[in-house]
């Protein structure tokens, strides 16, 4: 079952926008939570936000369903949904005020990919012109391979107006600090000289409504199962925006229908940033609470016995997927409360475990038309593989026995053969916010 998620639930988007509009931080710029007038161009613009449910059969008695949020071939990530709504809000602000907008997004990769695609899409469809809407992205160096070629890179004028900055430092999360500094130090100056608002776009509310639509789709797809069975929503996470948004939508549906939706949550992370799982299990982000690994010299693997962490790994601090770079996310505490109230758990996976399960996952995903390459070195986005590895391990280890149905949120998967990587000659390497201002 495939739908255009935003177009299908435009009425719900408007209702949810009104609800969270009062939460906007008035001390920093952000467009109102309001869409432009709906016309054929906007419907075409939103049509990229496709989603699909696909039954994958069962695994050890658990029904497995994929919620595929990666249907936009230009991004192959769930961030498309929120990015389209954000750009639509920007267009609405431009139309109402005459001001231009520069969207600024520090990102580990996928937010930048999706927002750049949404801006490019708006320009191509003619919803706005290249002077009115621009995008500035800042990514860590380890994520450069994720960024795609588009008209924003191949057209010289658009490339100049929509620069890609790359942070050369070792701490990927530092792009957020640089982003905050840039906004604080230069947004006023940019507005005064060019009538352009800088929109620092990382606020969770920018993603909340798009992610809430998952709950409406789920309610439509599983109408008879909502009360009869326990449903677990599994997601590879950095800050768990997707699951928090789903829960926001779920609560709205419960209020509207007076029905209880019995869904719990499974957080899946990698060792480098397993902060949410640590905090869920132990109430702390301290890595001192990590299980103690012992090197098995006969295999070269580090091993331990805590079922919530990799039983075997090549690296006890492994960065499996550069998408996940956030330490000590503020969202962790709200997610803990949701899991305490609804059930669920958290699990950390390793590359070794992903590879160990890759054949099984390849077969599971065939009904969804998702092809895992034989040469796994071609994979440039591991979120989906991590999610399925986490689900398989959780079932095998008895972590999620109380749930009957498992919905895996497919948030990102692509290989190097799916797209043309950006030419590195057009990237701007920076070390601080001072290096960025000359580009805008």
Regions found by a protein language model. Give the residues of each.
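PLP-dependent amino-acid enzyme catalytic core
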Residues: 1-440
């Amino acid at each position: 079952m495939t739908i255009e998620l935003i177009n299908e639930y435009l009425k719900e988007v408007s209702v949810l926008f009104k609800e969270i509009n009062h939460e906007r931080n008035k001390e920093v710029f952000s467009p109102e939570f309001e869409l432009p007038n709906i016309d054929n161009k906007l419907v075409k613009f939103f049509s990229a936000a496709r989603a699909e449910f696909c039954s994958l059969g069962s695994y050890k008695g658990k029904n497995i369903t994929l919620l595929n949020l990666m249907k936009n071939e230009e991004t192959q990530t769930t961030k498309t949904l929120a990015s389209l709504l954000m750009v639509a809000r920007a267009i609405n602000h431009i139309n109402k005020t005459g001001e231009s907008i520069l969207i600024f997004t520090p990102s580990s990769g996928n937010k930048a990919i999706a927002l750049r695609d949404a801006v490019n899409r708006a320009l191509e469809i003619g919803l706005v012109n290249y002077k009115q809407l621009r995008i500035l992205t800042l990514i860590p160096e380890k994520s450069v391979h994720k960024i795609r070629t588009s008209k924003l890179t191949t057209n010289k004028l658009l490339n100049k107006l929509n620069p890609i900055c790359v942070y050369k430092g070792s701490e990927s999360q530092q792009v957020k600090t640089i982003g905050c500094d840039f906004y604080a130090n230069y947004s006023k100056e940019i507005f005064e000289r060019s009538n352009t608002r800088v929109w620092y776009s990382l606020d969770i509310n920018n993603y909340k409504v798009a992610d809430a639509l998952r709950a409406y789709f789920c309610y439509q797809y599983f109408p008879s199962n909502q009360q009869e069975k326990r449903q677990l929503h599994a997601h590879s996470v950095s800050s768990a925006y997707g699951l928090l948004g789903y829960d926001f939508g779920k609560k709205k549906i419960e209020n509207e229908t007076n029905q209880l939706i019995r869904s719990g949550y499974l957080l899946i992370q990698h060792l480098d940033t397993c902060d949410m799982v640590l905090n869920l299990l132990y109430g702390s982000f301290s890595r001192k609470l990590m299980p103690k690994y012992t090197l098995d010299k006969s295999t070269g693997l580090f091993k331990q016995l805590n079922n919530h962490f990799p039983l075997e790994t090549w690296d006890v601090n492994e960065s499996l997927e550069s998408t996940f770079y956030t330490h000590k996310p503020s969202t962790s505490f709200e997610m803990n409360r949701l899991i305490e109230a609804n059930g669920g758990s958290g699990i950390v996976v390793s590359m070794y475990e992903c590879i160990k399960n890759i054949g099984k996952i390849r077969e599971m995903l065939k009904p969804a038309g998702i092809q895992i390459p034989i040469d796994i070195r071609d994979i440039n986005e591991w979120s989906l593989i991590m999610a399925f590895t986490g689900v398989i391990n959780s079932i095998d280890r008895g972590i999620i026995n109380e749930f009957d149905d498992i919905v895996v949120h497919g948030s990102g998967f692509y290989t190097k053969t799916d797209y043309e990587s950006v030419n590195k000659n057009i990237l701007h390497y920076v070390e601080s916010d001072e290096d960025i201002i000359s580009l805008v």
